[in-house]
């Protein structure tokens, strides 16, 4: 709202681009619940076809891509967070895109011309820059991109086609490596830095100094504030949780509760669909085993992405919540689909499609069961205590 009005913003604990995106809905529909939630919901819907395309590229099977997309659509966190006016939706969206285009680059054959490699690298870097300017958690994902990038670079140079007569590596390899490295500095460092800095133009305009010096100064001052703010949060919260609790859905965050009507309750919470959370964790472990034993590139890709989003939280001492696990849901679903794909390779021994459809249907059934507490619909108190309180720490 402040950015739209051209005044200094009150809430400055995150980079501004996510709120600028949110402001598009407010400009279109006014300062109303529909207006401030519109863009988040739109991005939430947009994730689904993007994930489908990603899964189709990863595994090449329509049935797996469809079931993986349904798993995201049926995830509790996906519904809850994309309906709220929060920036977590944009972080997830851009993480999805930056990993998709990195995968497209990694799967290009060794010896592919620079021009063919440039586009997926550019798009991966572009969406990483946009994501980082929306929320810092996207920066965690960039660590995974860096690891994957250098693994891919090593493999492409190692497998570079040899000359048919001499058996020596073609001389174009060094030229290609120089071009790729120089281009990567541009698309993963310089362009994202420019996007990040330019996202602070509303700050500079509000302060009356839109010069380059004023823009950089406004950006830098906010970085210092954000670092101080996030490292200095010491307050407690009854629905906070630590990273090791996220792995098992131990503590949902309760956004709203109303017990004013006797015998009825209204709850509104964010947590991961148990099928995705628990099944996905087992699937990530399976991917880790396959990455080590079979040196499976797909499995390694998924494990690196998952760890890049999770491991930084090991070292963060400030109060945290279940929604911080939201970006990891992407890799839980990728891991589940990897397991489906692995089973499909043994279809003469295992009826993999019924198993995949059963898992997907189970997630959809839980989505229907828990729907009232994902959107804040009033329910009889017995419904929560008898059907929804699976763990003592679940606030239903």
Protein language model annotation of sequence segments:
Residues 259-263, 267-295:
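Hydrophobic, aromatic-rich transmembrane alpha-helices
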Residues 59, 98-121, 150-160:
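Membrane-interface transmembrane helices that cradle and orient dolichyl/undecaprenyl
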Residues 46, 51-74, 93, 110-119, ...:
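Transmembrane-helix signature of polytopic, membrane-embedded enzymes
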Residues 15-20, 29-49, 66, 81-85, ...:
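Loop-to-helix entry region of an early transmembrane alpha helix in multi-pass inner-membrane enzymes
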Residues 116, 147, 153-157, 161-188, ...:
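Transmembrane helical bundles and short interhelical boundary loops of multi-pass, membrane-embedded
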Residues 68-73, 80, 128, 132:
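Short helix- or helix-capping micro-motifs
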Residues 40, 77-90, 134-137:
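Short acidic/glycine- and proline-prone juxtamembrane loop motifs at membrane-interface regions
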Residues 38-59, 97-101, 283-287:
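Transmembrane-helix motifs of polytopic, lipid-linked glycan transferases
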């Amino acid at each position: 709202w402040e950015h739209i009005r051209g005044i200094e913003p009150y809430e400055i604990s995150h980079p501004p681009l996510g709120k600028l995106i949110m402001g598009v809905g407010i400009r279109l529909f006014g300062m109303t619940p529909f207006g401030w939630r519109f863009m988040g919901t739109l991005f939430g819907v947009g994730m689904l076809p993007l994930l489908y395309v990603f899964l189709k590229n990863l595994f090449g099977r329509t049935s797996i891509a469809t079931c993986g997309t349904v798993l995201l659509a049926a995830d509790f966190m996906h519904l809850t967070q994309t309906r709220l006016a929060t920036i977590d939706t944009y972080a997830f969206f851009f993480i999805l895109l930056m990993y998709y285009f990195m995968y497209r680059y990694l799967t290009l054959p060794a010896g592919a011309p620079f021009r063919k490699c440039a586009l997926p690298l550019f798009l991966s870097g572009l969406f990483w820059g946009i994501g980082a300017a929306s929320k810092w958690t996207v920066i965690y994902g960039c660590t995974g991109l860096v690891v994957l990038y250098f693994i891919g670079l090593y493999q492409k140079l190692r497998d570079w086609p040899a000359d048919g007569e001499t058996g020596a590596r073609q001389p174009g390899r060094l030229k290609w490596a120089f071009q790729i490295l120089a281009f990567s500095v541009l698309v993963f460092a310089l362009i994202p830095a420019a996007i990040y800095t330019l996202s602070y133009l509303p700050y500079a305009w509000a302060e009356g100094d839109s010069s380059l010096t004023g823009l950089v100064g406004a950006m830098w001052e906010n970085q210092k504030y954000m670092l101080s703010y996030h490292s200095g949060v010491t307050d407690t919260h009854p629905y906070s949780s630590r990273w090791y609790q996220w792995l098992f859905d131990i503590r949902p965050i309760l956004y709203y509760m109303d017990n004013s009507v006797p015998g009825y309750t209204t709850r509104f919470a964010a947590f991961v669909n148990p099928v995705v959370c628990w099944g996905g964790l087992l699937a990530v472990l399976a991917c880790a085993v396959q990455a080590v034993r079979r040196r499976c590139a797909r499995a390694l890709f998924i494990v690196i992405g998952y760890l890049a989003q999770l491991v930084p939280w090991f070292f963060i001492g400030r109060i945290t919540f279940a929604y911080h696990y939201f970006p990891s849901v992407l890799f839980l679903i990728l891991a589940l689909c990897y397991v489906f794909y692995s089973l499909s390779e043994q279809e003469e021994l295992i009826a993999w499609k019924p198993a995949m459809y059963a898992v997907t249907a189970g997630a959809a059934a839980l989505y229907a069961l828990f729907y009232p507490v994902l959107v804040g619909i009033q329910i009889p108190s017995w419904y929560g205590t008898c059907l929804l309180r699976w763990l003592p720490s679940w606030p239903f």
